[in-house]
A protein has these predicted regions:
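Glycine-/charge-enriched secondary-structure boundary and capping motifs
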Residues: 30, 39-40, 44, 48, ...
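Gly-rich Lys/Arg/Thr-decorated short loops/hinges at beta-loop-alpha junctions or inter-strand turns
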Residues: 79, 120-138
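Glycine-rich phosphate/pyrophosphate-binding loops
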Residues: 7-16
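Alpha-helical support elements that line or immediately flank enzyme active sites
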Residues: 1-5
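Short, well-ordered loop/turn and helix-capping segments at boundaries between secondary-structure elements
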Residues: 6, 87, 111-114, 178-185
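Long, low-charge, small-residue-enriched segments that form tightly packed helices used
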Residues: 139-143
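Glycine-rich anion-binding loops of enzyme active sites
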Residues: 15-116
Length: 192
């Protein structure tokens, strides 16, 4: 959903397409899938006022082979791949990630829905650093996302946001770099 915020979305218009993946039949996997469906489909989506009208499931996520006369098997962990989409009344209010250095006294602001927890489990960075596990990013309070959508829409309407980029695909440094590339500018960050 944060990827969509560059556009003037309204949460009730947001829909999700969900691909639920699990190695059903493996110990604990059916229960883990149920907990995932419950958390997303029965708790988070209703709290946000959004729905999942489309999707698919892949419930045999395992591989099995024979090696040296022994059967080996690797089940995939429960995974959920989500795409979000929304209809817009007018696309002209959509922001780009392009930083603009022609204006004086602008500030690049990080809004941290993770509340300083820096959860990186499963990220590419964690994998590169050999720390693939750990706590994964999560939305602790649905109201935080609702408030963010509301605030961004108000600030956009008031002309107070010049550019937008979420940090879900690589974190703060990747977002800042992509914004600088888009604007053909350099950037100096002071992270307090």
């Amino acid at each position: 959903v944060t990827n969509l915020l560059a556009a003037p979305i309204e949460l009730p218009r947001v829909k999700l397409s969900a691909n639920w993946m699990a190695a059903c039949g493996e110990p604990g996997e059916d229960a883990a899938l149920y907990e995932t469906v419950k958390a997303v489909g029965m708790e988070l989506c209703p709290a946000l006022g959004i729905s999942i009208p489309v999707g698919k499931d892949s419930l045999s996520m395992r591989t099995q082979w024979s090696e040296g006369g022994e059967t080996k098997k690797v089940p995939s962990p429960v995974s959920l791949i989500v795409s979000a989409f929304a209809t817009l009344a007018d696309v002209r209010g959509t922001l780009t990630p392009q930083l603009d250095n022609t204006m004086d006294d602008t500030t690049l602001v990080l809004i941290d829905l993770g509340k300083g927890r820096h959860r990186m489990g499963g990220s590419v960075l964690a994998q590169v650093l050999g720390q693939g596990g750990g706590e994964v990013p999560d939305l602790d309070e649905a109201q935080d996302l609702i408030s963010l959508v509301h605030a961004v829409n108000i600030l956009r309407a008031e002309g107070k946001i010049l550019a937008y980029h979420d940090r879900s695909d690589g974190g703060l440094l990747a977002a800042a770099a992509e914004m600088a590339f888009a604007g053909h500018v350099g950037v100096a960050l002071n992270v307090d």
